A protein has these predicted regions:
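Flexible, glycine-/basic-rich loop-and-beta segments that form/coincide
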Residues: 9-67
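Residues at the C-termini of beta-strands that transition into short coil/loop
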Residues: 4, 52, 215
Length: 225
């Protein structure tokens, strides 16, 4: 039978087929579903807030490959301060320049790793539902595993920042027509109206459509809020 996995404590909004064998003498009119207990959906926000804050990497600036570092990344992100006059949306501008960028300026973020020790690991799952915490948390570990970020070129990084701030303001990601001119991608099919929502920020208040990862074919669709 088929279930919506996000209705059963799995932080992924996908339909899943489960094959379950039940002895005929235990079977009831309710079918196998009576053995499943629904739980409240686990949101993107709940999952990401239980993990350490990380920065992305940066791979290219103005088309030239560069060596990533926190200083290079932060300098490129903070270049937004010089673009203020190009942002016409007042609400996006206010959140971006009064809150988001000042927070980045004060931050000190790593990119994670296959494993990195952290004193925050023990309390990281405290706010998650008990069953999910039991599944994710291993007291023998002293840090986080398989939590690392990918690199992006500077133009995409700027689009991701604008996209996430716009999503915070309006509750939905911008379409291509909503971007300022200097953030418009140089895609051949842009004017054809194809994939106008190719850049999408995850809704923090809903389960993710997939376990988030930067995949070459759809990496723009899972921007973190």
């Amino acid at each position: 039978f088929q279930i919506n996995s996000d209705e059963y404590g799995i932080p992924q909004a996908r339909k899943r087929v489960i094959i379950m064998g039940i002895r005929s003498d235990l079977m009831s009119s309710g079918g196998p579903r009576r053995y499943l207990e629904k739980s409240h959906p686990i949101t993107v926000k709940e999952i990401l807030e239980s993990m350490p804050k990380l920065r992305s990497g940066i791979s290219k600036i103005n088309g030239q490959s560069i060596k990533d570092s926190e200083d290079v990344w932060k300098k490129e992100v903070l270049n937004w301060f010089g673009l203020k006059s190009k942002i016409k949306d007042k609400e996006v501008k206010e959140l971006l320049f009064k809150h988001f960028l000042p927070a980045i300026k004060k931050s000190s973020l790593s990119r994670g790793d296959e494993f990195f020790a952290s004193s925050d690991y023990k309390k990281s799952c405290n706010n998650l539902p008990k069953d999910l915490k039991k599944w994710l948390f291993d007291p023998k570990l002293k840090g986080f595993i398989n939590s690392s970020t990918r690199s992006h070129m500077d133009s995409d990084l700027k689009r991701y920042i604008y996209n996430s701030v716009h999503t915070e303001v309006y509750g939905k990601p911008p379409l291509l027509d909503d971007y300022p001119d200097f953030l418009q991608p140089n895609h051949a099919n842009k004017k054809q109206g194809v994939h106008k929502d190719r850049f999408r920020t995850l809704d923090p208040e809903r389960p993710s459509k997939t376990i988030t990862s930067h995949i070459s074919k759809d990496g723009h669709a899972f921007i973190h809020f």
